[in-house]
């Protein structure tokens, strides 16, 4: 049983890693690709990239709760394998996309199959207990970190043979992972813990509204929402910001993302396993959010390219907050509804991705345009810092309410 659990954890980690590699492959070359296809400047390319992210996220927002609910009915294994196969098909399509319309179509397909994160997170929740829950969820961040090391490097190296080659490689990885999972991945959700599929709970709004029955999740979900939203200041604009302000090349962007990946991997894969149990979830969340805020603000005032690499340190250290938030939220939901919860959380993340990229990229495009009263390419980072401070406030309110409830129960 223990060996099966370890094998399953390894598979889930590799699955998430491959997902992020596919994403990381695109980032360094996307500005150049969009400018080449559409013959536009950096600001307009940034805005177009925001709408591509919008297409991906809007689709994922709609399908994530459906995938989560299907995994609660049929189990995690078949849904996860289906998502992996679909991701492979998506990359094959993108490898031959001749126009921007085909890229948009590919992003829509990726939004549907990208819900593999939903099932993977539910799988982790199934096989975790209170002692290792935060550490196991830290693997998600570690996969992001390693993916951001490997993905941009693959994109840079294989891109030398043509812009489509990295997508073919990503498709091959997805299909290999599908075959591996088909033979070694056990089911994590026993039949007596499954429930019937309910369309009312399988829509993004319904899934979120259903979470109202858990008393303290409201404030924690708002805190999580603000963290996700703030992250798009970086996710949507890093390449365009560094090109505009420092004149970085795709190679330099790829190296910087490799540094991000290395730092995130260390924090999520190693540091959270030591620091989070020592600090506890509440203090990990507070300290992490403050570090996030500091790093985000410093990005906006950086005056030289090397400063961006230095300022990555406090920002990435803030990553201790993510697993602690995830662990706190999942601990308040019973095992029968973990799939639904993860679907709702993925929908929440996707909702911020529907809002965040257009807001952050258009704010960036405006702040560097002649129409802006002041040239301020760091404007999205300043907005992100404000959102992160708001997240810390909502987390504080949630924990204060939780403590008051515990005291009330003791008195009664």
PLM region descriptions:
Residues 63-75, 267-281:
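Helix-to-loop junctions at the C-terminal end of transmembrane segments
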Residues 159-172, 362-388:
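A membrane-interface helix-boundary motif in multi-pass transporters
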Residues 75, 96-101, 113, 247, ...:
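Helix-breaking motifs and short loop linkers at transmembrane-helix boundaries and internal kinks
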Residues 29-46, 236-253:
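Short amphipathic helix-loop junctions that connect adjacent transmembrane helices
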Residues 282-325:
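C-terminal transmembrane helical hairpin of 12-TM major facilitator-type secondary transporters
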Residues 61-100:
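Conserved MFS/SLC helix-loop-helix module at the cytosolic interface between two early adjacent transmembrane helices
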Residues 1-5, 186-223, 244-245, 411-412:
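Juxtamembrane intracellular "pre-TM" segments in multi-pass secondary transporters
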Residues 106-146:
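Cytoplasmic helix-loop-helix junction between adjacent transmembrane helices
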């Amino acid at each position: 049983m223990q060996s099966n659990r370890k094998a399953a954890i390894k598979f889930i980690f590799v699955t998430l890693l491959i997902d992020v590699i596919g994403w990381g492959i695109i980032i360094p070359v996307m500005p150049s690709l969009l400018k080449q296809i559409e013959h536009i400047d950096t600001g307009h390319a940034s805005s177009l990239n925001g709408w591509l992210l919008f297409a991906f996220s809007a689709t994922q927002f709609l399908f994530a709760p459906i995938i989560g609910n299907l995994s609660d009915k049929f189990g995690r294994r078949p849904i996860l394998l289906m998502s992996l196969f679909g991701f492979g098909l998506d990359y094959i399509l993108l490898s031959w996309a001749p126009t921007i319309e085909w890229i948009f179509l590919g992003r829509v397909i990726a939004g549907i199959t990208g819900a593999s994160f939903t099932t993977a997170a539910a799988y982790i929740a199934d096989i975790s207990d209170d002692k290792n829950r935060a550490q196991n969820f830290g693997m998600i961040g570690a996969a992001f970190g390693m993916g951001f090391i490997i993905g941009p490097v693959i994109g840079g190296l294989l891109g030398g043979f043509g812009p489509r080659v990295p997508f073919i490689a990503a498709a091959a990885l997805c299909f290999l992972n599908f075959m591996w999972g088909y033979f070694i991945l056990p089911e994590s959700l026993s039949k007596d813990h499954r429930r019937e599929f309910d369309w009312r709970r399988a829509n993004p709004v319904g899934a979120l509204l259903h979470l109202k029955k858990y008393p303290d999740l409201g404030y924690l979900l708002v805190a999580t929402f603000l963290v996700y939203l703030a992250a798009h200041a970086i996710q949507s604009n890093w390449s365009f910001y560094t090109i505009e302000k420092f004149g970085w090349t795709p190679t330099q962007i790829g190296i910087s993302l490799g540094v991000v990946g290395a730092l995130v991997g260390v924090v999520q894969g190693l540091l959270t396993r030591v620091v989070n149990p020592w600090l506890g979830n509440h203090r990990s969340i507070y300290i992490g959010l403050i570090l996030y805020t500091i790093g985000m603000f410093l990005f906006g005032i950086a005056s030289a390219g090397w400063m961006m690499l230095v300022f990555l340190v406090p920002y990435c250290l803030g990553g201790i907050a993510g697993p602690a938030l995830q662990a706190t939220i999942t601990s308040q939901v019973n095992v029968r509804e973990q799939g639904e919860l993860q679907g709702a959380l993925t929908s929440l993340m996707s909702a911020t991705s529907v809002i965040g990229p257009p807001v952050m990229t258009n704010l960036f495009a405006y702040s560097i345009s002649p129409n802006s009263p002041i040239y301020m390419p760091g404007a999205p980072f300043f907005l992100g810092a404000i959102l992160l401070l708001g997240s810390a406030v909502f987390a504080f309110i949630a924990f204060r309410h939780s403590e008051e409830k515990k005291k009330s129960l003791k008195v009664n």
